[in-house]
């Protein structure tokens, strides 16, 4: 990948189980050979590996992917890197109005934590906090800056 030639890291979000179903072989080749950090929700990852449940998908991820953050809605998330496995609790939202953008905001918070040099569990907590913030409003763009939230959550990590 061009980014690797430039010394950069490639993160990918699977984004939609329908797309994964349609382009499974291409996604698997990309995920298993090029992607450094994989983000996926439960539906997307079970679709990618054509398995019936999250635990089976998790085993496939552990065999084929070095670094992944897998979201499970109110069940939280699981972060894997090599032999490390972190189960992250979901941050309860003030209310659930619209889940559009939850995965994107999880990834944004997680990557922010990674760039801050935080441990993986703390990165997962940042992602969960950002996801909780976005689902408590309508639309996928935060209504207010998230930096204060990130700093507050990171300070507790």
Residue ranges and their predicted role:
Residues 41-50:
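A short, active-site helix/loop in glycosyltransferases that binds the activated sugar's phosphate group
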Residues 17-23, 48:
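Active-site glycine- and acidic-residue-rich loops that bind
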Residues 35-41:
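A short beta-strand/loop micro-motif in the catalytic core of glycosyltransferases
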Residues 6-15:
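Short beta-strand/loop segments at the ligand-binding rim of alpha/beta enzyme cores
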Residues 15-17, 43, 73:
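Active-site beta-loop-alpha junctions enriched in small/polar residues
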Residues 2-5, 24-25, 29, 50, ...:
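Conserved phosphate-binding/catalytic region of the ribokinase-like
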Residues 31-33:
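A conserved, positively charged/aromatic
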């Amino acid at each position: 990948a061009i980014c690797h030639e430039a010394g950069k890291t490639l993160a990918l979000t699977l984004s939609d189980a329908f797309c994964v179903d349609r382009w499974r072989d291409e996604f698997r080749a990309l995920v298993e050979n090029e992607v450094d950090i994989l983000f996926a929700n439960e539906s997307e990852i079970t679709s990618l590996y054509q398995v019936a449940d999250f635990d089976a998908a998790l085993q496939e991820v552990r065999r084929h992917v070095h670094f992944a953050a897998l979201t499970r809605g109110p069940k939280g998330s699981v972060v894997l890197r090599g032999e490390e496995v972190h189960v992250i609790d979901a941050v309860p939202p003030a209310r659930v109005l619209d889940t559009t953008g939850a995965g994107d905001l999880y990834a944004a918070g997680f990557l922010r934590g990674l760039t801050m040099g935080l441990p993986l569990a703390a990165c997962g907590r940042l992602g969960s906090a950002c996801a909780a913030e976005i689902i408590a409003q309508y639309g996928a763009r935060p209504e207010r800056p998230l930096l204060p939230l990130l700093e507050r959550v990171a300070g507790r990590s």
